[in-house]
C-alpha cells in the first residue's frame, strides 16, 4: 500500500499540526554550543520549512493558540502586577519602560531606514527581544487594523519572517552580553551582591540546600539545668543560638506546649524541632542527657505548606516582622512570580508572594490564617472562572475608540491579557476562586504558544526564500542593535539615574528582557541568587509592556508616513 504523505497531511489539519509540533519540539532540544534552540524556535523552523512545501493550516487554530498563550501570561502576572505597579516597584517599572520603550523606538527607526513594511519591523522587534508577546500583540492588531487583504497577508507573513530571522540573534547576543557586559563596568557583581547582602541581611548562597525540620527529644539532666542557670526559655534564646525550637515539655507525666516563661527543671523531657544542622549546634549539655524515644512526645505532624500572602497585616511588611520562629514555624522558600527569592529578613512582602513554611500542622495553619491562606493542593482547575474571564477578555478586545478620522481598537491580545491579570489577581486574594494548578497553566500556555508558532510558520513559509535574500543582512544588523542597545541604555539609566545596586540592576535588566538563560548567567557571575530580586521585580510588568509594544508598533507605524 502506498501512502502519499503530502496528501495525508494536507487533508488533515490536526495531523499536520501535531507532526509540526513533534518535529519542532525535537529540533528545539538541539544545542548550539551552550545555547539550546528552544521549543519556540524549533517549531517555527519546522513550520517554515513545511510551509515552503505549501502545507497550510486552518487560521482558527492559530488564533486559539495565541489567545490561550496571552491569557495565561496575564494569569501568571496577575498576583504581583499591581503591587509592582503601585508600590515599591517604581524603579523596576521605570527600568522595564526604558527597556521596552527604547527597543520600540529603535525598531521603528530601523524599519523606516531600511524601507521595511510593518510586518518585518514588528517581527524584527519581537525576535530581537526574544519576546513572543510582542509577536502576538502585533499579529492580533494587524488582523484588526483594516488593512486590505493582500497587504495584510504580506504583513503577517513578514511578521513571522522577521521573528524567525532575528530570534536566535537576539537570544545569543543577550547571553553574550550578560556574560561580558558586567565585566565592562567598574563594579564587580560578586562584590555588589555581597554589599546588598550585608545591608539587608540576605543569604547570598545561590545553591542553598533546604531540609525539612526534624524532631528529637531529650531528658533534662543536671548539666542542662546548670547551663540554664534558672533562666526561662525567652531569656535563654535557644532558637537564636541554635535554630532549634522547644515544641513540647513533659513534666510529671503531663505533656504541654511551653511559653517563653517556662523554666527547665530536672527530669523534664523536651521535644526540639529544627533543621539537622541546628540540632548539631545544641549545647553539649542537651546531648549529655539521655535522648528520649517516646511516641507521645515525638508524635508531631510536621507539614510543609505553601502560604499565599494576602492579608493587610502581612502585605508591605518585612519577613522578620512575621516572627515565624516565635510560632514554631520554619521558612524554606520565598517565591515571587514563579521565581525563588533569597531568604531575607528585610525583604518586603507583596500580595501574591508564596512562602513555603514547615512546622507543626496546627502552627502552620495559624500562621497561614494570619498572613493569607494555604495554597490549594489540587489537580482540579476552576474551568468556570477560566472560561468566564476568557469571554470577558474577548469582549474587552472588541472595544473600539474613535478619534476624529482615527480609530483604535483594544484588540484580543490586550483584552485577554487584562482579563488574565484580573483572574490572577483575584486568585491571589481569594483562596477558592479561579484556581489553576501551575502545571496545568504551564501546559496550556506552552501548547497555545506552540500552536501559534506552527500557524505563523506554515503561513509564512512559502515566501521565506525571497524574503531572506532581500533583507537577511539588514536583519542581522537590526537584530543586534535592537537586542543590545536597549540593554546598554537600561544599564546607564539604572546605574547613573536610579543609582541601583549592580547585582539588582543586572537582574532587573534580564527580567525586563524576560530571558531566563541570561538571568542564570548573571547569577553565576554574581555567585549569588540576589539578582533574582531584580529579575522578579521587572519580569511581570515587562511581559505586559511587551504585549502592548506589539500593539503600539502597529498603531504608530502609519502615523510615521
Swiss-Prot record:
Q: Which InterPro entries match?
A: AAE_transporter (IPR050144), RCK_C (IPR006037), RCK_C_sf (IPR036721), Transp_YbjL_put (IPR023017), YidE_YbjL (IPR006512)
Q: How would you describe this protein's topology in the membrane? A: Multi-pass membrane protein
User: Its Gene Ontology biological processes?
Assistant: potassium ion transport
- Regions crossing the membrane: 8-28, 32-52, 66-86, 94-114, 158-178, 383-403, 406-426, 447-467, 475-495, 537-557
Cystines in this chain:
none
Subcellular location per the Swiss-Prot or TrEMBL entry: Cell membrane
GO cellular component assignments: plasma membrane
Keyword terms: Cell membrane, Membrane, Repeat, Transmembrane, Transmembrane helix, Transport
Limits of the RCK C-terminal domain? 200-288, 292-373
Q: Name one GO molecular function term.
A: monoatomic cation transmembrane transporter activity
Q: What family does the Swiss-Prot or TrEMBL record give for this protein?
A: Belongs to the AAE transporter (TC 2.A.81) family. YbjL subfamily.
From the Swiss-Prot or TrEMBL record, give the protein name. Answer: Putative transport protein YbjL
Amino acid at each position: 500500500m502506498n501512502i502519499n504523505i503530502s496528501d495525508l497531511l494536507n487533508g488533515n489539519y490536526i495531523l499536520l499540526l501535531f507532526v509540526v509540533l513533534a518535529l519542532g519540539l525535537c529540533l528545539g532540544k538541539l544545542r548550539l554550543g551552550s545555547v539550546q534552540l528552544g521549543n519556540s524556535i524549533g517549531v517555527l523552523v519546522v513550520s517554515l520549512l513545511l510551509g515552503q512545501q505549501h502545507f497550510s493550516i486552518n487560521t482558527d487554530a492559530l488564533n486559539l493558540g495565541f489567545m490561550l498563550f496571552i491569557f495565561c501570561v496575564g494569569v501568571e502576572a496577575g498576583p504581583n502586577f499591581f503591587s509592582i505597579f503601585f508600590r515599591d516597584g517604581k524603579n523596576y517599572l521605570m527600568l522595564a519602560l526604558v527597556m521596552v520603550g527604547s527597543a520600540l523606538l529603535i525598531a521603528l527607526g530601523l524599519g523606516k531606514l531600511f524601507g521595511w513594511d510593518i510586518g518585518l519591523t514588528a517581527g524584527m522587534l519581537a525576535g530581537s527581544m526574544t519576546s513572543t508577546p510582542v509577536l502576538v500583540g502585533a499579529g492580533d492588531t494587524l488582523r484588526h487594523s483594516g488593512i486590505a487583504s493582500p497587504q495584510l497577508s504580506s504583513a503577517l507573513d513578514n511578521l513571522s519572517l522577521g521573528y524567525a530571522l532575528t530570534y536566535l540573534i537576539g537570544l545569543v547576543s543577550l547571553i553574550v552580553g550578560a556574560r561580558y557586559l558586567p565585566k565592562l563596568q567598574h563594579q564587580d557583581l560578586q562584590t555588589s551582591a555581597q554589599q546588598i547582602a550585608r545591608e539587608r541581611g540576605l543569604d547570598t548562597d545561590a545553591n542553598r540546600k533546604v531540609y525539612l525540620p526534624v524532631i528529637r527529644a531529650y531528658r533534662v539532666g543536671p548539666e542542662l539545668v546548670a547551663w540554664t542557670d534558672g533562666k526561662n526559655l525567652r531569656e535563654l534564646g535557644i532558637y537564636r543560638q541554635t535554630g532549634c525550637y522547644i515544641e513540647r515539655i513533659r513534666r510529671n507525666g503531663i505533656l504541654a506546649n511551653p511559653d517563653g516563661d517556662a523554666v527547665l527543671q530536672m527530669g523534664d523531657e523536651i521535644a526540639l524541632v529544627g533543621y539537622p544542622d541546628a540540632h548539631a549546634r545544641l549545647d553539649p549539655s542537651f546531648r549529655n542527657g539521655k535522648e528520649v524515644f517516646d511516641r507521645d512526645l515525638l508524635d508531631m505532624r510536621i507539614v510543609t505548606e505553601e502560604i499565599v500572602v494576602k492579608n493587610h497585616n502581612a502585605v508591605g511588611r518585612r519577613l522578620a516582622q512575621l516572627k515565624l520562629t516565635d510560632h514554631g514555624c520554619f521558612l524554606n522558600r520565598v517565591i515571587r512570580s514563579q521565581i525563588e527569592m533569597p531568604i531575607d529578613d528585610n525583604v518586603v512582602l507583596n500580595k501574591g508572594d508564596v512562602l513555603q513554611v514547615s512546622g507543626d500542622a496546627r502552627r502552620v495553619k495559624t500562621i497561614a490564617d494570619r498572613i493569607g491562606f494555604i495554597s490549594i493542593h489540587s489537580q482540579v482547575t476552576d474551568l468556570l472562572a477560566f472560561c468566564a474571564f476568557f469571554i470577558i477578555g474577548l469582549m474587552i478586545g472588541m472595544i473600539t475608540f474613535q478619534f476624529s478620522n482615527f480609530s483604535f481598537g483594544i484588540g484580543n491580545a490586550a483584552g485577554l491579557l487584562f482579563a488574565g491579570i484580573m483572574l490572577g489577581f483575584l486568585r491571589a486574594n481569594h483562596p477558592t476562586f479561579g484556581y489553576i494548578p501551575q502545571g496545568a497553566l504551564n501546559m496550556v500556555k506552552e501548547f497555545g504558544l506552540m500552536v501559534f508558532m506552527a500557524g505563523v510558520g506554515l503561513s509564512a513559509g512559502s515566501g521565506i526564500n525571497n524574503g531572506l535574500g532581500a533583507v537577511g543582512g539588514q536583519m542581522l544588523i537590526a537584530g543586534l542593535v535592537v537586542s543590545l542597545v536597549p540593554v546598554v541604555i537600561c544599564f546607564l539609566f539604572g546605574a547613573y539615574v536610579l543609582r541601583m545596586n549592580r547585582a539588582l540592576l543586572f537582574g532587573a535588566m534580564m527580567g525586563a528582557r524576560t530571558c531566563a538563560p541570561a538571568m542564570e548567567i548573571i547569577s553565576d557571575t554574581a555567585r549569588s541568587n540576589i539578582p533574582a530580586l531584580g529579575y522578579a521585580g521587572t519580569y511581570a510588568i515587562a511581559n505586559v509592556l511587551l504585549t502592548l509594544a506589539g500593539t503600539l508598533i502597529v498603531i504608530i507605524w502609519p502615523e510615521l508616513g
